[in-house]
Amino acid sequence: TYIETPQAVSPVFLEVKSKDEEGIGHKFRLVATSQAIINLMTDGTVDHQIQDPDLVQEIQRLRKRYGHRLEPRMFIYYDRLSLKEKKSIQGYPYQKIRVTIDQNLVFRDQAVSLFHGKKGEPLLEDDFVIMEIKAPGQEPQWLKDILEKYGLVKQKFSKYSCAYHKSQGLD
């Protein structure tokens, strides 16, 4: 959720990310109340708020694969700055470029409910952020120039995987 202090009726997001046999990533996302999402994950109950049959099918597949009862295991919180390209920049074609910067990342594997506040263990070192650039197709030269100028390199990173490793002392 993007709500500062979520309540039981606050909208929350469920995202399921997976890769197919060819390694192509797929993402399913829905918005509903936390209770509707918990019910779907734990006992398969589909609330009227959940209208995406593909996502429901994916959840049912995961429930079958992992023993029918999925439950929250990790809480991850961060502050996000989201930027997107203006519709038109003189001299440049519009390319739908988006940049997100996540900071103040914390996690916990106990009391994982949204309703237990935002506290947790730091996920990254102090003063580190995660910047994600989404540029469909080829990155424009101006973006490549900025990344090169500041020594920024592409790197894969999973917030959940990092939090899991830290919680298990595998770091």
Where are these regions (language model features)?
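Phosphate-end processing signature that detects enzymes handling 5′-triphosphorylated RNA
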Residues: 1-171
